[in-house]
């Protein structure tokens, strides 16, 4: 994900990163972001000293479908907390804010690194529901997730990484769901 977002160069063994057909492998991260790639990093990384609303507004693009109202519609709890500093939010609220902040950039591609990490079951269910809503709305999401149930529930396509970052398996989630032996071999379940 960090390579796709322009935060790390592609491996020396070759390869490239393309966004809408354009090779962005050598571009700095801010130029990759301008081309519509947004990252929700592992660990959330919100601006703790800024309010919820300031966190959202600081990255907002003036044009596009995502604005404060739409983010607040997706995550109503953020409306209640809009004047609170980011550091005062629970882990789940911080994750909602991190996702909302990325959406405010109106991304073509939303990268999400371990969005379920450290979340309570009720919050995890909410995030799962919202990822499903984003999927239905046509938002492209690339998810790196160790929670297999979550990944299989929201994905259109699954890639399981093997040795040295190679793709060990790729296909529709139903194929893995219907083949527990294959799933166990690939991910050790």
Model-assigned labels for residue ranges:
Residues 1-189:
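Glycine-rich phosphate-binding loops of nucleotide-dependent enzymes
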């Amino acid at each position: 994900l960090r390579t796709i977002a322009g935060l790390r160069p592609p491996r020396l063994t070759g390869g490239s990163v393309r966004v809408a057909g354009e090779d962005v492998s050598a571009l700095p991260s801010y130029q990759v972001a301008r081309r519509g790639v947004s990252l929700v990093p592992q660990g959330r990384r919100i601006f703790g000293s800024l309010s919820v609303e300031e966190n959202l507004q600081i990255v907002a693009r003036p044009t596009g479908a995502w604005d404060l109202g739409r983010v607040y519609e997706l995550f109503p709890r953020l409306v209640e907390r809009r004047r609170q500093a980011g550091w005062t939010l629970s882990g789940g609220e911080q994750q909602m804010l991190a996702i909302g902040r990325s959406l405010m950039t109106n991304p073509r591609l939303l990268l999400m690194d371990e969005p379920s990490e450290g979340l309570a079951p009720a919050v995890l269910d909410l995030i799962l529901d919202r990822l499903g809503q984003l999927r239905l709305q046509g938002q492209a999401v690339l998810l790196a997730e160790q929670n297999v149930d979550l990944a299989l529930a929201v994905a259109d396509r699954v890639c399981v990484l093997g040795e040295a970052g190679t793709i060990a398996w790729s296909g529709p989630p139903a194929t893995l769901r219907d083949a527990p032996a294959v799933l166990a071999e690939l991910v050790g379940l």
